[in-house]
Amino acid sequence: LGDVYKRQKLAKRECSEARFTHNGKRYFAIAFPNGSGGFEVRNRYFKGCIAPKEISHIRQSGKARNTCYVFEGFMDYLSFLTLRQESCPNYPELDGQDYIVLNSVSNVNKALYPLGNYERIHCFFDNDHAGMEALRQIRKEYGRDLYIRDASQTYNGCKDLNEYLQKQVERKRQVRSVKETRSQSPKKKNGFQL
């Protein structure tokens, strides 16, 4: 329950709720803002965009950062923040770098100009052809001048960072379930029983 609460709190800080009509049906969804006034919207039944489609560039306040973490979609960005807070709850270091969310790998060209302001780029793309192609485009543009890290190795064996988080959550749930079952089992008596 604590994990769910943390994720909900994080989503409330980073996103908003959108209510909209699509094909004559009313929906509500989580809405993640982009840099042009549009939103990426998601719910169980719908994945889309309230135009215009654009990248989301999250800059930290204060001095300029020299590192940027780049994500394919906002669910991966939220998954990263969740994993970082869970692994380092007292000092998650979420503001040590800026973030760019492509909101689609087709937006990678829109991210190239702002990425030129960073010395280090960490790419958290999907483990598929489109993700590798986006990484290749960034390396082609800046490979000689900047440090570019393929961070998808962190969640190797999963499609993306969000799937990795979901597997971690499921693993924790299973461990908790086993512990609860063991604690509820009747204790064995010492000795033999005839």
Per-region residue spans from a language model:
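Short, small-residue-biased leader/transition segments that mark boundaries at the very start
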Residues: 1-5
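Phosphate-handling DNA/RNA-contact segment within nucleic-acid enzymes
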Residues: 20-114
